[in-house]
């Protein structure tokens, strides 16, 4: 793959943030310097994801998907799609980049063929409530779809069969994730709880089985995202309570609490901790929050290593890739 020197794609570490100010910003992770800003005209950005080959970044918003080139300084999206109604809340990619998946408020999860330059919707999975999150099993053959009725759907892409889990009815599933080892699935909800399942099967033609493992009363307010670390030893949960909490997957005990709460009693809330992403070595985590900042933290000590300031409104999503392609 060719990368142009001086572009985002030429940097071994790609960090992008976006939110309510209609921009996507790219940062030099170690220095905190903003290296590129892309205008995202039509709406806020709800979700960001970098393609596995690090050539493009997808940004989803209200009724559209935009894909920007990371290997040039072209300010305009190189792929645009406007044929989905309402907010698109979630986006991700098959590991070899053949297709992309999305989910949104129109109650559908979709699979898009990326091999043609115009986005073709290949498959649609319809549910009965707006979708908040979609995550791909490491086997690349099952999608987990979380909706606002509190249901997690496991959509088997090979058979089109689906199973449903309803850990806490009436509380919206806001985020779900499976660890890279495919040992656990976690889901968080609008009550602030985190549910963890053990995974078995999911290899070859075996269907994945989910066995309830634990329920963590992770947050006292709305939980917004959960993410396992690349080494599968940690689970992070982000919340409207201004914290991101890091849990050990060995026993799901709390290891570190990352907080943006002010130590000044007179200062009002700095807002929600919207999302997070681990570094490839699982030692650091980047968070996005309503106080217009992204932050880089040391996972073990909870120390803030870097702040990324420049957004004019809340930062609600980020994408982080520091893996070196072989």
UniProtKB/Swiss-Prot annotation:
Organism lineage string: Eukaryota, Metazoa, Chordata, Craniata, Vertebrata
GO molecular function list: protein serine/threonine kinase activator activity; protein-macromolecule adaptor activity
Induction, per UniProt: By insulin in adipocytes (at protein level).
Recorded superkingdom: Eukaryota
Tissue localization of expression: Expressed at highest levels in the brain and testis, followed by lung, heart, kidney, skeletal muscle, spleen and liver. Also expressed in epididymal, abdominal and brown fat, small intestine and pancreas.
Residues in cross-link Glycyl lysine isopeptide (Lys-Gly) (interchain with G-Cter in SUMO1): 313
Modified residues (N-acetylmethionine): 1
Localization in the cell: Lysosome membrane; Cytoplasm
GO cellular component: cytoplasm; lysosomal membrane; serine/threonine protein kinase complex; TORC1 complex; TORC2 complex
WD repeat residue intervals: 1-37, 40-80, 83-122, 126-165, 168-207, 218-257, 268-309
Cross-link (Glycyl lysine isopeptide (Lys-Gly) (interchain with G-Cter in SUMO3)): 86, 215, 245, 261, 305
Signal peptide: none
Residues where Phosphothreonine is found: 51
Function: Subunit of both mTORC1 and mTORC2, which regulates cell growth and survival in response to nutrient and hormonal signals. mTORC1 is activated in response to growth factors or amino acids. In response to nutrients, mTORC1 is recruited to the lysosome membrane and promotes protein, lipid and nucleotide synthesis by phosphorylating several substrates, such as ribosomal protein S6 kinase (RPS6KB1 and RPS6KB2) and EIF4EBP1 (4E-BP1).
Family: Belongs to the WD repeat LST8 family.
Xref: PANTHER family: G BETA-LIKE PROTEIN GBL, TARGET OF RAPAMYCIN COMPLEX SUBUNIT LST8
Subunit field text: Part of the mechanistic target of rapamycin complex 1 (mTORC1) which contains MTOR, MLST8 and RPTOR. mTORC1 associates with AKT1S1/PRAS40, which inhibits its activity. mTORC1 binds to and is inhibited by FKBP12-rapamycin. Within mTORC1, interacts directly with MTOR and RPTOR. Component of the mechanistic target of rapamycin complex 2 (mTORC2), consisting in two heterotretramers composed of MTOR, MLST8, RICTOR and MAPKAP1/SIN1. Contrary to mTORC1, mTORC2 does not bind to and is not sensitive to FKBP12-rapamycin. mTORC1 and mTORC2 associate with DEPTOR, which regulates their activity.
Record has Repeat as a keyword: yes
Protein modification: Phosphorylation at Thr-51 by CDK1 promotes ubiquitination by the SCF(FBXW7) complex, followed by degradation.
Protein name: Target of rapamycin complex subunit LST8
GO biological process terms on file: positive regulation of actin filament polymerization; positive regulation of TOR signaling; regulation of actin cytoskeleton organization; TOR signaling; TORC1 signaling; TORC2 signaling
InterPro entries named among the record's database cross-references: G-protein_beta_WD-40_rep, MLST8, Quinoprotein_ADH-like_sf, WD40/YVTN_repeat-like_dom_sf, WD40_repeat_CS, WD40_rpt
Gene: Mlst8
Chief place where the protein resides: membrane
SMART domains: WD40
Keywords: Acetylation, Cytoplasm, Isopeptide bond, Lysosome, Membrane, Phosphoprotein, Repeat, Ubl conjugation, WD repeat
Cross-link Glycyl lysine isopeptide (Lys-Gly) (interchain with G-Cter in ubiquitin) placement: 305, 313
């Amino acid at each position: 793959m060719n990368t142009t020197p001086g572009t985002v794609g030429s940097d071994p570490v790609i960090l992008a943030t976006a939110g309510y100010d209609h921009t996507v910003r790219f940062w030099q992770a170690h220095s905190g310097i903003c290296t590129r800003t892309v205008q995202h005209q039509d709406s806020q950005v709800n979700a960001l994801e970098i393609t596995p080959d690090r050539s493009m970044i997808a940004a989803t918003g209200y009724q559209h998907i935009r894909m920007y080139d990371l290997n040039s300084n072209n300010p305009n999206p190189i792929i645009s799609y406007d044929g989905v109604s309402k907010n698109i809340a979630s986006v991700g990619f098959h590991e070899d980049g053949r297709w992309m998946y999305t989910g949104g408020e129109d109650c559908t999860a979709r699979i898009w063929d990326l091999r043609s330059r115009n986005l073709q919707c290949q498959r649609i999975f319809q549910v009965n409530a707006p979708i908040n999150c979609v995550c791909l099993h490491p086997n690349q053959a099952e999608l987990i779809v979380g909706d606002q009725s509190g249901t997690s759907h496991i959509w088997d892409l090979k058979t089109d069969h689906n199973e449903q889990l309803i850990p806490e009815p009436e509380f919206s599933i806001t985020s779900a994730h499976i660890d890279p080892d495919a040992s656990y699935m976690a889901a968080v909800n609008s009550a602030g709880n985190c549910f963890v399942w053990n995974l078995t099967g999911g290899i070859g033609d075996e269907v994945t089985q989910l066995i309830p493992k634990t329920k963590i009363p992770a947050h006292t307010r709305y939980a917004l995202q959960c993410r396992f670390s690349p080494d599968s030893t940690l689970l992070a949960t982000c919340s409207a309570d201004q914290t991101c909490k890091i849990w050990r997957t060995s026993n799901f005990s709390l290891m570190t609490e990352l907080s943006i709460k002010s130590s000044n009693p007179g200062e009002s809330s700095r807002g929600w901790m919207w999302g997070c992403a681990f570094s490839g070595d699982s030692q650091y985590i980047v968070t996005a929050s309503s106080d217009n900042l992204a932050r880089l933290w040391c996972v073990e000590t909870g120390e803030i290593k870097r702040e990324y300031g420049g957004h004019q409104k809340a930062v609600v999503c980020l994408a982080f890739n520091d893996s070196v392609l072989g």
